[in-house]
């Protein structure tokens, strides 16, 4: 029972997504997690990065204020928050699939006999089609939310960090005395990683948009095929009609003899048998 339930969940989950949504989007999400776990902690480590942020001043509190102005939000925490937000719509969609499968599972358990199944077959088919339509629109909605989140993340990353990390930063905030020059460690490495994460986010945005376009084209194609007159043509039905057509050119004539005529014909004696 558990195996069939899991197969049903997997079938419902893979019914509407195209290969882009089924393979590429999860792969890019996994790539983000690997990049953050393998490289992000080493490149943008919180304690080490702040300790390597050097300012030409001995004024108390100046270095902390300048570092806060340079990095209002740590890039590593920003990307972790972004991945969490992007994964929320997919998690909600999976929860909706589980609810849909459990609801249909309980409804099918209520059907006890074959007669009830046959009598309710049409209603069950309508309910299944309605459920499939709800799953499709739920999938489209979660793709739309993901598209908005990816676009907001790209804009936020560009606003906070730009495309490259500068090697120096001029700070003019209190309690610093005048302008203070501060220097960042490994700016080239940080710039490369920043552009990599920007590119991965851009690919996720592009593939999410492509998935929506493919879903729209697929739905339009199904509607066009359903309305097309040629789709109603069936060679089997046409051949069946030809086989069942009456043969008017060769009518069948049925001749019946009357009982009286049959008796008279049987009572006649041939001429050769007469004396």
From Swiss-Prot:
Compartments where located: Cell membrane; Cell junction, Gap junction
Cited Pfam families: Connexin (PF00029)
UniProt region (Disordered), positions on chain: 254-275
Superkingdom of origin: Eukaryota
PROSITE patterns: CONNEXINS_2
Membrane topology according to the record: Multi-pass membrane protein
Any GO CC annotation of this UniProt entry: connexin complex
Chief localisation class: membrane
SMART domains assigned: CNX, Connexin_CCC
GO biological process entries: cell-cell signaling
Gene Ontology terms for molecular function: gap junction channel activity
Compositionally biased tracts (Basic and acidic residues): 254-267
Residue ranges crossing the lipid bilayer per the database entry: 23-43, 78-98, 135-155, 197-217
Cytoplasmic side: 1-22, 99-134, 218-275
UniProt entry keywords in alphabetical sequence: Cell junction, Cell membrane, Gap junction, Membrane, Transmembrane, Transmembrane helix
Extracellular side: 44-77, 156-196
Protein task: One gap junction consists of a cluster of closely packed pairs of transmembrane channels, the connexons, through which materials of low MW diffuse from one cell to a neighboring cell.
Family assignment from sequence similarity: Belongs to the connexin family. Gamma-type subfamily.
Subunit record text: A connexon is composed of a hexamer of connexins.
Protein name (record): Gap junction gamma-3 protein
Species lineage: Eukaryota, Metazoa, Chordata, Craniata, Vertebrata
Encoding gene, per UniProt annotation: GJC3
